[in-house]
Structures are given as structure tokens and as C-alpha cells.
């Protein structure tokens, strides 16, 4: 039997760390198809912290792609599970036959599904990528992303699967300990990545609430982002008084970030695609409602779980936010499909499907 190989094809340390730790701690002990990884980027201590996994690291996305293609050609029974945002060479290999459809299973993280960049090289590449995506053996994704993908590629198998957000189920009831009143605190974006469209989001928050709320913008990730942070700070201070604007430029440990989220009353996410599911889960767990772009299909997942959804086009005020908080507080968090531990069984199913052991 040929063991499934997992591919992290882009050097995205935060996401790669989450996936590797999840597989090491949760899946590797029960499935031989959860142990082999090819990773773009440096080791960064992963080998030591994930002893249950067999990890191979590659210095560039191109080097990783060449290694994957070589393995695919050498053994056509070899199957690969591609996680999230990977690279151009892998899509082109699928398009050219270097990797066959039956070898290619893809967990959609969002960015590789949507065509949001206006750069010329991206606009030229998107049609090729779209054709290639129609040739994958199967996809795994959120409900909203499955719906989006199926409209373009109705013949490709799709299965529900959620990114393994680090969550402590014992915290599901913790939010009820806090009494929410007074000035609203609004979280804008889930990281310092430009895809959060921070400046547009700050303007939207100001248009809805004016300079009457506390605004928190976490921008400690990714690194080497100071010029953009300064740009966002300048734009924010043109709208909000200094005491109402908090731009966080330092990377935070998980527990610190969790404590920050739990001080918020509302999350505001203007991006028009599915991303930041980890932050959304942690906010929902704390009874903090989220404002989404109507073009972000994750609202379908939230609605399916009977969670209140606010949109950027809604008329928002404190009363609307407090009512959404009340509705969230009445939801039994233990039944939410994309919460831990409920997302575990779909992962076991996904491994069997990608490995060819399940119909």
C-alpha cells in the first residue's frame, strides 16, 4: 500500500505550524496516512516538535514542486493531499499531466480559490488555474467554498472539511462570565496581511459608528510589515482619536491573542472571500458576533449552524450588536460543526478518501 503524502506548498509559518501540530497531536497515532509531509520553507523546529511526523523541507516553492512532480511521475499510485495556498508549478503540473487527477486532492483554504488580485501576471494565470482546478481528484472545504467551487466545477467531488482551529471546548461557556456594556470594542481584521483591507474596513467602521468606539487592529503577523502598519495607523488616526485606536504591531502568543479577542464586542471583516476562520471561531466561541462581506461565503456555514450573521451592508449600531451577542449566547456551542472536537471526524474521512480507501 502507498501511503498518502501531505503537501504544504507555500512557506506560511503560522498556518503550517497549526496543521503540523494538529496532525502530530491528533491524527498521526490513528492513521498511517497522516504522517508523511513535504513542506516549503525551513524546519523552524517542526521536526523536534512533531516527532510523530516524517517531514521533508524544501528551500523554495519551486524545489518542492519539482520533488512532488518527480514522485508523482515515478509512482502513479502515489496520492497527495495539498493543503491550502500552494504554488503555480503544482497547478501547471496538474494541467500538463505531470500530476494526474487521481493523485491530487486539495483542501481549499480560500486564497487559491478566489481571483482577487488585479496584477497582470495573476490575471493571465487565473484562467489556467481555473481549468486545472477542474481536474483535481476531489476537494475539501467549508460549505461556502464548496458551493462556490461547485458552480465552476460541478463534476468534481467535494467534501465538508474545516481548518483545524486551535480551540479549547471548555471555554465554550466562558463568555457568559463577562457583562458587556459601555463603549463597543471592535476588532478589525485577523492579521496584518493586506487582504484584510484594513483602511477600507476602518472607514466602514467609522461610517457606521463614528469616533464612538474602541478599534483594535492586530497587525503583528506577518513580519517585516512596518511600512503598511504605518500606512494603516495614519489612515486610522485620520478617522479615530488616538485613545480609540489601537494598532498592535507586535506578534502575540496564542493565549495573549485569545485574551485580546475576548475583550472585543464585534469582529469586522471586510474581505470578499473565506479567510480567517480561526479568528472567527474564537470570536463566536466568546459570543462575539462578526460582520462579514456578503461575498464571503462563510456566512453560509454560519447560517447552517443557526448563528447570527451581520453584513457590512447592514445598518449597524450598539443595539444591533448587543442583540447579536444575545443570540450567540443562546447557541449551544458544543454542536457547532466547525468547532473542536466536531471537525475531527471529517478529517478522518478526508484521509481515507484522499488515500483511496473510501468511496
From Swiss-Prot:
Keyword Membrane: yes
Full protein name: TDP-N-acetylfucosamine:lipid II N-acetylfucosaminyltransferase
Keywords: Cell inner membrane, Cell membrane, Glycosyltransferase, Membrane, Transferase
GO cellular component: plasma membrane
GO biological process: enterobacterial common antigen biosynthetic process; fucosylation
UniProt-listed Enzyme Commission number(s): 2.4.1.325
InterPro entries assigned to the protein according to its UniProt record, in alphabetical order: WecF
Function: Catalyzes the synthesis of Und-PP-GlcNAc-ManNAcA-Fuc4NAc (Lipid III), the third lipid-linked intermediate involved in ECA synthesis.
Topology of this chain in the membrane: Peripheral membrane protein
Family statement: Belongs to the glycosyltransferase 56 family.
The protein's annotated pathway: Bacterial outer membrane biogenesis; enterobacterial common antigen biosynthesis
GO molecular function: 4-acetamido-4,6-dideoxy-D-galactose transferase activity; fucosyltransferase activity
Subcellular location(s) per record: Cell inner membrane
Main location: membrane
Pfam families referenced in this protein's UniProt entry, alphabetically: Glyco_transf_56
Catalytic reactions of this protein: beta-D-ManNAcA-(1->4)-alpha-D-GlcNAc-di-trans,octa-cis-undecaprenyl diphosphate + dTDP-4-acetamido-4,6-dideoxy-alpha-D-galactose = alpha-D-FucNAc4-(1->4)-beta-D-ManNAcA-(1->4)-D-GlcNAc-undecaprenyl diphosphate + dTDP + H(+)
Entry keyword annotation includes Transferase: yes
Amino acid at each position: 500500500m502507498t501511503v498518502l503524502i501531505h503537501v504544504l506548498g507555500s512557506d506560511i509559518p503560522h498556518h503550517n505550524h497549526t496543521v503540523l501540530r494538529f496532525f502530530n497531536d491528533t491524527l498521526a497515532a490513528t492513521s498511517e496516512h497522516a504522517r508523511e509531509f513535504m513542506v516549503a520553507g525551513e524546519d523552524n523546529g517542526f521536526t523536534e516538535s512533531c516527532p510523530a511526523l516524517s517531514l521533508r523541507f524544501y528551500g523554495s516553492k519551486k524545489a518542492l514542486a519539482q520533488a512532488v512532480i518527480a514522485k508523482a511521475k515515478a509512482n502513479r499510485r502515489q496520492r497527495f493531499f495539498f493543503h491550502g495556498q500552494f504554488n503555480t508549478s503544482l497547478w501547471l503540473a496538474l494541467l500538463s499531466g505531470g500530476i494526474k487527477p487521481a493523485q491530487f486532492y486539495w483542501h481549499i483554504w480560500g486564497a487559491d480559490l478566489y481571483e482577487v488580485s488585479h496584477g497582470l501576471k495573476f490575471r493571465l494565470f487565473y484562467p489556467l488555474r481555473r481549468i486545472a482546478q477542474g481536474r483535481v481528484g476531489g476537494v475539501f472545504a467549508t460549505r461556502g467554498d464548496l458551493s462556490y467551487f461547485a458552480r465552476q466545477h460541478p463534476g468534481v467531488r467535494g467534501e465538508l472539511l474545516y481548518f483545524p482551529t486551535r480551540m479549547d471546548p471548555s471555554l465554550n461557556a466562558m463568555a457568559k462570565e463577562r457583562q458587556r456594556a459601555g463603549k463597543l470594542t471592535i476588532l478589525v481584521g485577523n492579521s496584518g496581511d493586506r487582504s484584510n483591507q484594513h483602511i477600507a474596513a476602518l472607514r466602514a467602521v467609522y461610517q457606521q459608528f463614528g469616533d464612538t468606539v474602541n478599534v483594535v487592529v492586530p497587525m503583528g503577523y506577518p513580519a517585516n510589515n512596518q511600512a503598511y502598519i504605518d500606512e494603516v495607523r495614519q489612515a486610522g488616526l485620520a478617522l479615530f482619536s488616538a485613545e480609540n485606536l489601537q494598532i498592535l504591531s507586535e506578534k502575540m502568543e496564542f493565549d495573549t491573542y485569545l485574551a485580546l479577542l475576548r475583550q472585543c464586542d464585534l469582529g469586522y471583516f471586510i474581505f470578499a472571500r473565506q479567510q480567517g476562520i480561526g479568528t472567527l471561531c474564537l470570536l463566536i466561541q466568546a459570543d462575539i458576533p462578526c460582520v462579514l462581506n456578503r461575498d464571503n461565503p462563510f456566512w453560509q456555514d454560519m447560517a447552517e449552524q443557526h448563528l447570527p450573521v451581520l453584513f457590512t451592508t447592514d445598518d449597524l449600531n450598539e443595539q444591533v450588536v448587543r442583540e447579536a451577542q444575545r443570540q450567540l449566547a443562546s447557541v449551544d456551542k458544543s454542536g457547532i460543526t466547525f468547532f473542536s472536537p466536531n471537525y475531527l471526524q471529517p478529517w478522518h474521512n478526508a484521509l481515507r478518501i484522499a488515500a483511496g480507501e473510501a468511496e
